[in-house]
């Protein structure tokens, strides 16, 4: 069952869900908590690589990713990152989230942003039980105009679902967890599969 606003506030109060900085009660509605955009981004650089062979040897996949992904781009508060039509960018939430082993989170984009062509997560919207860290956002502009994204703007909402019991392998305990404790706009680590 999805947690209600009352249950979300109780989980924040008792520390079973931790969101830092803690959201105001105005950011909690019905079944969700608003999250804001952080100031870190990554984009695909201009490159001459014709493709990335995702099934190739892991060293070759990683080398290709290193060639095409930018370093972290820091956008100060008050300034904007421009996402042009047809572009993909990675970013992070301003908030850091910690979930217990018996709660899964779900990230939803905002309808108002989707109506302008902004996809906030291309596919990955589940936040695993045991997650700890910032949430990477996979932006795609499917619209016709560049979109100005500013740090700390409301970018999406998290909702939470209590499981029938704690999972045996929470994310923060898995040895092969590729994005454990992430604080940055981490590029794909598919080469570690």
Curated annotation (Swiss-Prot):
Which Pfam families is this protein grouped with? DCD
Indicate yes or no for the key word Hydrolase: yes
The protein's matches in Gene3D superfamilies, at most eight in alphabetical order, are given as: 2.70.40.10
Q: Name one GO molecular function term.
A: dCTP deaminase activity
Source organism's superkingdom? Bacteria
First-tier enzyme category under EC: hydrolase
Which reaction is the catalytic activity of this chain? dCTP + H2O + H(+) = dUTP + NH4(+)
Active-site residues per Swiss-Prot or TrEMBL entry: 138
Q: Quick one: which pathway?
A: Pyrimidine metabolism; dUMP biosynthesis; dUMP from dCTP (dUTP route): step 1/2
User: Region labeled Disordered — which residues?
Assistant: 173-193
* Single Gene Ontology BP annotation: nucleobase-containing small molecule interconversion
Q: Which positions are tagged coiled coil?
A: none
This entry's Enzyme Commission designation comes to 3.5.4.13
Q: Which UniProt keywords apply?
A: Hydrolase, Nucleotide metabolism, Nucleotide-binding
List the CDD domains: trimeric_dUTPase
Residues annotated as binding dCTP: 110-115, 128, 136-138, 171, 178, 182
Q: What does this protein do?
A: Catalyzes the deamination of dCTP to dUTP.
Q: Which family does it belong to?
A: Belongs to the dCTP deaminase family.
Please give the NCBIfam families that the UniProt record associates with this protein: dCTP_deam
Subunit annotation: Homotrimer.
Name of the protein in question:
dCTP deaminase
Organism the protein comes from? Shewanella sp. (strain ANA-3)
Q: Which gene encodes it?
A: dcd
